[in-house]
Amino acid sequence: MAVGMMSLAVLGQTQSALQAQSRERTMFVSVLESDGTPVQGLVTADFVIEEDGVEREVLRVGRARAPMQLAVLVDTSGSAALAISDIRTGLEAFVSRLLESNELTLVTFGGPPRILVESTDQIDRLRGGIGRIFAYSDSAAYLLDALVETALGFERRESPRPVIVVLTSEGLDYSNHSSEQVLEALQASHVATHVILLKNLTNTGLGPSRFGNLDFGDSLFQRDQVLERGPRTTGGQRRDLLTSSATPDALDGLAGILTSQYEVVYSRPASLIPPEEIAVRMRRSDLTAQGIPARRTRD
């Protein structure tokens, strides 16, 4: 009888522990100063997590050490032709800095999306792929399609810490997906989306007449919605560059942000209804925070 009672007691304690653990939730958070510099050394009291406007208790804060699964999406349409050399230079340093403990894949979207290098932690394969990045003068971009396909790939693999980095021009986009479809796919896969937008690139030979009767006004509107809302709603960053020569510095800055992220663990009361909105902010007004909820692992 005593053994039976002890077994029940242990079982009850185990169930309580599992229930408590199931109520813990995690966010990956970037904290920046006003000049965009990542901030280190923060503690639980510095963070505020809110679910549907209700503040939750922050339990633990530490450096994010979970491996990242990064997909770098590169514009190889005709509009990006003048930037390709700077993109290659920036990516060489970017992948070298981020490869430790992480995996990267290269995807191009000048024409239909194409996986240039499958997910790997091998620097030689990535360098080889970077060397094969070329612009196609007669191609429009398919950025929105590339984002959806990449997000769905992360969803199928149940990637625990997925990240998308987009390098894109403002050229024509021939995608079949709408902005809402893209944003839904990004949020469903819990993928932080970062954008480096190369502005003022021109290719006078690439015009709407090349691509039939597509409504390019709506196409560009859909693309711009994704570039504006994607980073903001997924805990990412957006950087607009007036010259492609700034690409290496922009990628280096993004690498610094990604390697300086926090893993913030907070408590959520037991509920059958998940919150519609999860937000993170800092108690210090001079700091800004962007974060995305981590995917829950299966029990």
What residues fall within each predicted segment?
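Bacterial N-terminal signal peptides
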Residues: 1-9
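Scaffold/interface architecture of coatomer-like assemblies
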Residues: 12-299
